[in-house]
Every structure is written in structure tokens, then in C-alpha cells.
Curated annotation (Swiss-Prot):
Active-site residues, record numbering mapped to chain: 17 (cysteine persulfide intermediate)
Record's protein name: Sulfur carrier protein TusA
Protein localization: Cytoplasm
Keywords of the record: Cytoplasm
GO-annotated biological processes: tRNA wobble position uridine thiolation
Similarity section: Belongs to the sulfur carrier protein TusA family.
Length: 79
């Protein structure tokens, strides 16, 4: 685990592509710049999709744990 301060948590366990990224986008849209979203997922596609989403949308992927499920991603909202 990490010491990153989490502002919101999004549980996408049991959901499959494209739902985890769609819910991430919807959730982060309502957050303030600089806030951190913890995404919990078990869809293997998120190991590719969440980092790509962050890069495309100018959010910062602070950390990820993808060795075992559930996967965890800490995303800091950009502009």
C-alpha cells in the first residue's frame, strides 16, 4: 500500500471494458484539480486502459499495483 492521500475511491470490481474507464472519466470530471482518485479494478484491460486514459486526459498516474487483483490505481486530476 501507499501513503498517498485519497480524496475519492471508485470500485469497479466485476466491471469489464469499457465500463471502468467510463466510470473513471465520469468520477474524475466531478473532482477538483489536484484531488486523488483511487480506482479498484479486476479487469485485466485496466492495466493498459487506465494509464492510457491518464496520459490522454492529462491526469497523473501517481502509483499502480497490478501484480495481483484487485488492481489499484492512484490518479491525480489534472486540468
Amino acid at each position: 500500500m501507499t501513503d498517498i492521500k485519497i480524496d475519492q475511491t471508485l470500485d469497479t470490481l466485476g466491471l469489464r471494458c469499457p465500463e471502468p474507464v467510463m466510470l473513471t472519466r465520469k468520477t474524475i470530471r466531478n473532482m477538483a484539480e489536484g484531488e486523488v482518485l483511487l480506482i479498484v479494478a479486476d479487469d485485466p484491460a485496466t492495466t493498459r486502459d487506465i494509464p492510457s486514459f491518464c496520459e490522454f486526459m492529462d491526469h497523473q498516474l501517481l502509483n499502480s499495483e497490478t501484480e495481483n487483483t484487485p488492481y489499484r490505481y492512484w490518479v491525480k486530476k489534472g486540468l
